[in-house]
């Protein structure tokens, strides 16, 4: 088995081994992974954080050792808490990194960083505060950053910043935590899931107080939440049908 680490800010993770393939997720600076298959230009990887799989360009990561991988995997993540920061290499060149990037491998990559970091589990009350960091970020299928993010990437990154692990897709996240029977039982920071006409869970958002929800739909935005689903305050209509509320923390 071979191992890798992302040494660039935001790297696309694709469904197939081609630049034109669907963006299924993104690999952020400091993310580590197992290399499942290597081709001339592409590698199929499995991310350590959420076991998500996809194809990454061979020019956009560095191979690492099994020992380094295991060391980094068991370490408590040290995360960038600023929207944009910079790390510096041995040539004094700056490299941008974004909110939620992992900084545990700085010494392995011969990089330095003197910005703000966060590590460990935070109180549940911090979830909404972290969610506001992504407010108005444009929607991007497969995205995980303030410059483009999808609904489950948003919830995953917000929870990650507070020391909690969610899976990558909304349907996967819906398998986590404890189901609540009523909205009234929920607390700010709980997750609400929404399904389509076929009953497939396709959307997720973070519940706020007073029956509001923050979620990625066009952009990261705040709408009303009721027993039917999400009521879009701009369109004056329901846009998502509520399926289940889950308490993960």
Regions found by a protein language model. Give the residues of each.
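A generic structural signal for residues embedded in beta-strands
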Residues: 6, 35, 105, 193-194, ...
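...with weaker cross-activation on analogous glycine-rich loops/strands in unrelated enzymes
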Residues: 164-222, 228
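Boundary regions of SH3-family modules and the immediately adjacent low-complexity/disordered segments
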Residues: 1-2, 25, 32, 47-137
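Active-site nucleophilic cysteine motif
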Residues: 131, 145-162
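Short alpha-helix capping/helix-loop boundary micro-motifs
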Residues: 17-22, 84-93, 174-182
